[in-house]
Amino acid sequence: MGLGLKNVVNNDDELKKVVDELYCGYHGWDFTFGGLVAEKFVAGPEFTTFVTGSFDQPDDIKVYQPVERVFNDKLPDHEKFLSFDRLWDTYENEKPVGEKDYENLWEYFKPDATLEHAIKQLSIDAYCAVFGTGYGRIDIRMDKATGKMYVLEVNAQCGLSEDENYTSIGAMVRLGQDRFSDMLGAIIENALQTKLKRMKAATLINK
């Protein structure tokens, strides 16, 4: 929300214009609550993973099949990301990909097999760094010039669906070995384990 193609800036004047627009709000949404975040644009492939488990039991954390979000090759590098208008098909300020044909913004594929271990390990590290419990989706970018990976987000409230038109989890199910029901079962099991652990801790305190 609030993220558009014009947010990729190349000079101070462009930055000031974007900041001024954000402070004006968008459809009643206040984007300045809590401050604004500016970060380097990472040009390169984008990956996403889904994780279940708890940070305090890192050996039991499960990372499901990572997927690469491969953006339409008609787009220039600085447009290969999920802008709000294109993600939600609003097109108030931006044009759809392919204009008349409304081509897909991206497709999901398995990442290069040589990258999967690093993607999974970075996902676990990021999840534990924010004290993740239950589940989360991790978005990662790799700088195509250096090969270095960056965590874009750890989303603790990501959509849960096996429809990949709605969420990347559907693509993980299609490309991986796990069923969607397995993922939901792992989330429920972790929630029950966490609840039991807290109940035991409360019992010990009250003794």
List the model feature ranges, each with a label.
Residues M1-V8:
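A conserved helix-loop-beta module that forms one wall/lid of the active-site cleft
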Residues P58, Y108-K207:
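ATP-dependent carboxylate activation and anion-phosphoryl transfer catalytic cores
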Residues N10-G98, M149-Y150:
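Phosphate-binding site of ATP-dependent enzymes
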Residues K16-G35, D85-K144, M199:
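A long amphipathic alpha-helix within ATP-dependent nucleotide-binding catalytic cores
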Residues V8-N10, M142:
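Residues at secondary-structure transition points
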Residues K40, E79-L82, R86, N104-E107, ...:
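Flexible, active-site-adjacent loop/turn segments at secondary-structure boundaries
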